[in-house]
Amino acid sequence: MANALVWFRNDLRTIDHEPFLRASTADRCFAVHCIDPRQFETTELGFQRTGPFRARFLIENLTDLRSRLRSLGGELIVRVGRPETVLQHLLPSLAIDAVHFHHEPRTEEADTAESVQQLCDQHGIATHVAYGDTLIHPDELPFEIADTPELFTDFRKEIEKQCEARSPLEEPIRIHGTLPEEVNAGDIPTLESLGLSTPPLDDRCLNQFTGGQNAAQQRMEEYIWNEDRLRVYKETRNGMLHPNDSSKFSPWLAQGCLSPRMIADHVRRYEEERVKNKSTYWMIFELLWRDYFRWISRKHGATLFRAGGLRGVNVDWKSDRELFRRWQDGTTGYPLVDANMRELRTTGYMSNRGRQNVASFLTKNLGIDWRWGARWFESQLVDYDVASNYGNWNYAAGVGNDARGFRFFNITKQSRDYDSQGEYAKHWLPELRDLDVTEIHEPWKMSPERQQEVGATLGKEYPHPIVDLFDSAKENETIYMRAKAASH
């Protein structure tokens, strides 16, 4: 009798899941997810590596996955512990012959997988590793992973010319996975047991993310088909306020309740049944960005996380805790930055447009180590994934392969361009709700009398700008260019 174990990682789904599909043909198919306590440690900056929003989403995802596996005849074993330690005890208890899991192209996760591989080798247990978190399967890449083009444009052109995404795999019809009496399925942890508090509800939160494959599929149906928003995705994707400005698939992608191929399959059908346009192309374009960061992460490994980034530009970053705290709290005096940072802290989400602006401000105006920002995003974002997060921060800080040198965002211009009426800023900054359109983007230009009239006195209800936008950029450009010259 052959017994197989599926080690679920950041792939919490039953559809388009090669390890699960292969394991389902065994006489008995078991499944486990390990909540690694290292992911909940406190960083040297004083906050937890995984904050309450992502942790709550994980709990919901595991609850949904357990329910789905039970409906198929199986069970999800949940353990808190390092995977290699958990499996050391679990493999003999279940008399496992083969372990099936997805590869994750990231340094820390790869080290964990190697430890599991060694454990299985020691016990004569077969391991089967598959790839499932990219749009294009590595077997179909027109280059070796070690030869992944350094620039996204080169990567994209080669992929578009030669590759097509595979269709998603079907879900197994039935599995035989009843646990032996001596093996307990284990409880899915609570936020409290993970050392976290339940985040308070805030009626300003317009984006509701419920974990699980079922909720992910409902979101695809709603966004693509029911609301027909894919048709205008390219035009609306930079919006920051409304739930359907962009797809909001990213939380489910990050923890693997959706695969990129599941999304691409819907896009293909949409193009056949409704329309093929720039927006449908752009949805696939964004998934290719995601692929790019994954293969670059695998190619360069730990280099992605060093201060000098992929390009080795060793900028003399500041370590100013007070400036960093003001950025975290959304009290910089720049409404676009502050609104986005308060949304992040209140909801665990921020638009892509917002992320670009706050990252630019932290690195190009405050001159603070980009890795501090990356770690804060890791802690707060419900859709955090390591390759995209650190890849994008490399880019924003000017230390990534695709970075354009010292390119900084004019925050006030961005505010006018993407929040022209100030709706988003006023939504998250109620102290500025009575400012008119001419004032909301630069409140520091109001006269003292006008500040008092609208209840937004600078230094009292709303802060003065903590730096001058252009003077600070000029100062940090000098520091950056010096480091760039030294790196050649």
UniProtKB/Swiss-Prot annotation:
Binds 1 FAD per subunit. Binds 1 5,10-methenyltetrahydrofolate (MTHF) per subunit. Residues 2-135 form the Photolyase/cryptochrome alpha/beta domain. GO terms for biological process: photoreactive repair. PROSITE patterns: DNA_PHOTOLYASES_1_1 (PS00394), PHR_CRY_ALPHA_BETA (PS51645). GO terms for molecular function: DNA binding; DNA photolyase activity; FAD binding. It comes from the Bacteria. Its cofactor is FAD; (6R)-5,10-methylene-5,6,7,8-tetrahydrofolate. Keywords: Chromophore, DNA-binding, FAD, Flavoprotein, Repressor, Transcription, Transcription regulation. May have a photoreceptor function. Binds DNA; probably functions as a transcriptional repressor. Belongs to the DNA photolyase class-1 family. This is Cryptochrome DASH. It comes from Rhodopirellula baltica (strain DSM 10527 / NCIMB 13988 / SH1). The gene is cry.
